[in-house]
């Protein structure tokens, strides 16, 4: 089932320097909660400055949903320490609140209890909140409070030049974009390995279902927790953040211009379902527009091609201008065993897997084959640890045992690890391979199995509160290592100044401005 990558691996072993200079970044979301686990109703902590313009700490859907962002970094340890500093400072500046350590929320009785993220009075800030109003009215607020980790990854120019020859200008844009689309196609085919190893949401609180019927065969504990005994990541299931109305868009990952055209079409395609919501009611705007996507960011995807945007530029226009610059991996649950929601083992594994995805042959995929890859993902998400579980290839009927496929993949990853260790020194990547490959013979070692044992003992709420309390105490005590207190104060002040400048620069009323941007 795993493609033959032997020639590409032999090439890599002859060109180890092609991997020198991998760049990466992390984003981590987490809900602010009270000591009893209920959602915090306070505004964004003052010490964190403006959520609209802060470089490192912002908010996602809700005012209580923090998002931490590291700068691009070539050093894993430095990046994780930077992320930890953001958590340390925040833990000391959020009063008696804690950071919820799980992907799935708990103790939220009603969607109405969730305040949307607020970004001030600038047109840009109001637009961001209106977008969230649209998300709430389309999908429900509760679903939007699910948290995850995003891992951003780019290969060095040396890799592309070694692989594609001496490239520059338009030629580089085309070839590098084609290379990243290969990564994406392989990710759709084999990325289920991420929830298998690191999925950490095998259960949900009963309140999350809000009384809605479900066809999933949940088991229920006395304290009202619903779980699937072999599930890995309910966050990635249809209960989590997926968008059924997007499944017919037919967006593919074979060609830059085709992909962008599909995305642009989706933000112009009217939706009968969303038209029923209405655009405005009693003088209050309910969504930006009633199209399938309000804006491009609404496209749900487990992985995205990205380029840093310029001021006023849409994500797709940035891609058209310069091609794909990096990849955003979006399938990581919060790691409940780490105070910062992600750890070194995961980052090193993702490095290995992304390099493998760049090397392995990846035939073009039609939208129907893309839909077929979802079958493997769903199996792993809902019953990944089930004995005897098999996986298929695309829309074909042949089936292969998951443990065997996993071990075959890791045989390749071990060779990538040896190459990365040869240029970085030590054996850190090979150690990660040895630790993780054991999960295929012993699924009890996976994150989902480990966290489910705790949840069955103490419930999701009990587990979440215990981890949140322990991490709060730990982070509040730890000294900053990279950033200093004055760096945070300076960024707070600078972010507030930037927001004020944006508000002062607006010349049009929001309604007029919105007509041009909706």
Swiss-Prot record:
Alphabetized HAMAP family for the sequence: Glu_cys_ligase
* Highest taxon, organism lineage: Bacteria
Q: What EC class is this? A: ligase
Q: Which GO terms describe its molecular function?
A: ATP binding; glutamate-cysteine ligase activity; metal ion binding
Q: Which UniProt keywords apply?
A: ATP-binding, Glutathione biosynthesis, Ligase, Nucleotide-binding
Q: What is this protein called?
A: Glutamate--cysteine ligase
Q: Name one GO biological process term.
A: hyperosmotic response
Q: Which lineage?
A: Bacteria, Pseudomonadati, Pseudomonadota, Gammaproteobacteria, Enterobacterales
* Matching PANTHER family: GLUTAMATE--CYSTEINE LIGASE
Reaction it catalyzes: L-cysteine + L-glutamate + ATP = gamma-L-glutamyl-L-cysteine + ADP + phosphate + H(+)
Q: Does Translocase count among this protein's keywords?
A: no
């Amino acid at each position: 089932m795993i493609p033959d990558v032997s020639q590409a691996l032999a090439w890599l072993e002859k060109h180890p320097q092609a991997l020198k200079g991998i760049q990466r970044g992390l984003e981590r979301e987490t809900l602010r909660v009270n000591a009893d686990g209920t959602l915090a109703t306070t505004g964004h902590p003052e010490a964190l400055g403006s959520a609209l313009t802060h470089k490192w700490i912002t908010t996602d859907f809700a005012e209580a949903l923090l998002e931490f962002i590291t700068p691009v970094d070539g050093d894993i340890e430095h990046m994780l320490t930077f992320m930890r500093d953001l958590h340390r400072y925040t833990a000391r500046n959020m009063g008696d609140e804690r950071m919820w350590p799980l992907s799935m929320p708990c103790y939220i009785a009603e969607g109405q209890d969730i305040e949307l993220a607020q970004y001030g009075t600038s047109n840009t800030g109001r637009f961001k909140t209106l977008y969230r109003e649209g998300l709430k009215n389309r999908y429900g607020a509760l679903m939007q409070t699910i948290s995850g980790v995003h891992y951003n990854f780019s290969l060095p120019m040396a890799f592309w030049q070694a692989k594609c020859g001496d490239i520059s200008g338009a030629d580089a844009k085309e070839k590098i974009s084609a290379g990243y689309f290969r990564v994406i196609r392989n990710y759709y085919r084999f990325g289920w390995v991420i929830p298998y190893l690191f999925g950490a949401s095998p259960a949900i609180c009963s309140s999350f279902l809000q009384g809605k019927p479900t066809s999933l065969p949940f088991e229920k504990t006395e304290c009202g927790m619903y779980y699937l005994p072999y599930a890995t990541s309910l966050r990635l299931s249809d209960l989590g953040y997926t968008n059924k109305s997007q499944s017919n868009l037919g967006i593919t990952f074979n060609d830059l211009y085709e992909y962008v055209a599909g995305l642009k079409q989706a933000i112009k395609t009217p939706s009968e379902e969303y038209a029923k919501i209405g655009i405005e009611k009693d003088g209050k705007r309910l969504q930006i527009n009633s199209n399938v996507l309000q804006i491009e960011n609404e496209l749900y995807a487990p992985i995205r091609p990205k380029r840093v945007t310029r001021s006023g530029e849409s994500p797709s226009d940035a891609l058209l201008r310069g091609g794909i610059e990096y990849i955003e991996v979006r399938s990581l649950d919060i790691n409940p065993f780490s105070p910062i929601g992600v750890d070194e083992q995961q980052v090193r594994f993702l490095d290995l897997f992304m390099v493998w995805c760049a090397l392995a042959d990846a035939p073009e995929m039609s939208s129907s084959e893309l839909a077929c890859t979802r079958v493997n993902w769903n199996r792993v998400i809902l019953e990944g640890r089930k004995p005897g579980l098999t996986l298929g290839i695309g829309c074909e009927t042949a089936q292969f045992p998951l443990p065997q496929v996993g071990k075959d993949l890791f045989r390749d990853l071990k060779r990538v690890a040896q190459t990365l260790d040869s240029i970085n020194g030590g054996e850190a990547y090979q150690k990660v391979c040895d630790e993780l490959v054991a999960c295929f013979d012993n699924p009890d070692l996976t994150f989902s199995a480990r966290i489910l044992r705790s949840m069955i003992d103490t419930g999701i709420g009990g587990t979440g509160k215990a981890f949140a309390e322990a991490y709060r105490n730990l982070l509040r005590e730890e000294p900053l290592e990279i950033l200093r207190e004055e760096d945070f104060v300076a960024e707070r002040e600078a972010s507030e100044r930037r927001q004020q400048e944006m508000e002062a620069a607006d010349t049009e009323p929001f309604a007029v401005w919105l007509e041009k941007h909706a």
